[in-house]
């Protein structure tokens, strides 16, 4: 468990016209999700045995055309995604830390896909914000180095997300 305080910097950018999530709310809840993950999972994450005082990450809101472009350009997959993560720190074997600051990377979310998902899955009765924070919590797991290549890993990631979402009172997901 971490003894010293960690500063968390979250920067958001919205290039999607169809919905403007509340930036303050996004930053505050994302910080709480990340704090939960650090307190629960640091030893299993890419932060283990690292000396840091600050964690930085970016969240970009866009449309599915943009995520398709990213998928095509960086992952050789030509289809849109609801979320793409660029885990700069977890994926770099050098794990560069500058002045105690770790840049975890970037979460890119297609807000049109979020809206589409909520409208499609009426039976789940999630609102846009719940769906959005489900995706953000998932992206944070990837930025911390967790993946889900196997069913076991997938179940672990989803179980941890559910616990984290309880911290921001989105435990119905």
Name what the model sees in each region.
Residues 1-133, 144-173:
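An acidic/histidine-cluster motif and surrounding catalytic segment
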């Amino acid at each position: 468990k971490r003894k010293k305080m960690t500063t968390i910097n979250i920067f958001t950018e919205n290039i999607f016209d169809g919905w403007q999530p509340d930036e303050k709310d996004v930053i505050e809840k994302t910080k709480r999700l990340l704090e939960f993950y650090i307190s629960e999972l640091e030893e299993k994450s890419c932060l283990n045995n690292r000396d840091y005082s600050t964690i930085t990450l970016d969240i970009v809101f866009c449309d599915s055309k943009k995520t398709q472009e990213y998928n095509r350009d960086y992952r050789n997959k030509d289809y849109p995604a609801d979320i793409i993560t660029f885990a700069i720190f977890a994926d770099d074997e050098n794990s560069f830390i500058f002045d105690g600051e770790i840049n975890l990377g970037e979460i890119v979310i297609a807000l049109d896909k979020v809206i589409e998902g909520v409208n499609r899955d009426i039976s789940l009765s999630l609102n846009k914000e719940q769906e959005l924070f489900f995706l953000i919590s998932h992206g944070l797991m990837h930025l911390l180095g967790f993946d889900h290549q196997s069913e076991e890993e997938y179940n672990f990631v989803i179980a941890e997300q559910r616990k984290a979402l309880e911290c921001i009172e989105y435990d119905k997901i």
